[in-house]
A protein has these predicted regions:
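Basic/polar N-terminal segments that are highly enriched at the extreme N-terminus
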Residues: 1-20, 24
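Intrinsically disordered, low-complexity segments enriched in polar/charged residues with Gly/Pro
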Residues: 13-15, 34, 117-120
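General structural feature for long, well-ordered alpha-helical segments within catalytic domains
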Residues: 18-21, 25, 42, 46, ...
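N-terminal capping segment at the start of a domain
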Residues: 25-33
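Glycine-rich flavin
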Residues: 44-52, 56-155, 164-167
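Extended active-site and interfacial segments that coordinate phosphate-rich ligands
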Residues: 158-159
Length: 168
């Protein structure tokens, strides 16, 4: 019972810490919001600020360096970030949800992404713009995915594609 109470207290403290960090970033994000909108990309400094604050690790499993907090904490942080820059909040939402999704995958996939660097960010383009071909040991993706918010800051991507039935 004491162990559970301690874990819950730690999560409450982390939640509060994340909210404070997000609130502290609001003035900086307001200063950068015009350039983010004009350049149509979030400044590298902003991504680094969010990495340093741990925002991309809110939903990431603890075993891979994350905080493994609840989606409520993530959405509260995103809401605070939106007060400084809506575009930044959008990109945080897009990139920051992927640790939750990746945590649902087999551990082999998680090790592949976070095994060497638990700060690795993942983008996505779920629209099935590519073709998926089954090959020995997996699948081959080919195509052109036209957009993925925040992808220039990521090393991995979750992609959508179509598998066509074999001819014949």
């Amino acid at each position: 019972m004491a162990l559970t109470a301690t874990a819950e207290r730690t999560n409450i403290d982390l939640h509060s810490d994340m909210i404070k960090k997000a609130e502290n970033l609001i003035p900086v994000l307001k200063e950068r919001s015009e350039s983010a909108n004009v350049d149509r990309r979030i400044p590298k400094e902003t991504i680094q600020d969010m990495k340093d604050a741990g925002f991309f690790k809110i939903l990431q499993p603890k075993q891979y360096g994350g905080f493994e907090l609840d989606p409520h904490t993530f959405s509260e942080v995103q809401l605070r970030i939106s007060q400084g820059c809506m575009s930044t909040a959008w990109v945080l939402g897009v990139i920051g949800i992927h640790p939750f999704q990746l945590a649902l995958y087999d551990d082999k996939a998680q090790k592949e992404v976070w095994g060497e660097d638990d700060n690795t960010l993942v983008s996505s383009s779920y629209a099935p713009m590519g073709q998926v071909t089954p090959v020995d040991g997996g699948f081959k993706f080919s195509g052109h995915w036209q957009w993925s918010s925040g992808s220039e800051h990521c090393d991995w991507a979750l992609l959508g594609g179509l598998i066509f039935p074999p001819e014949g």
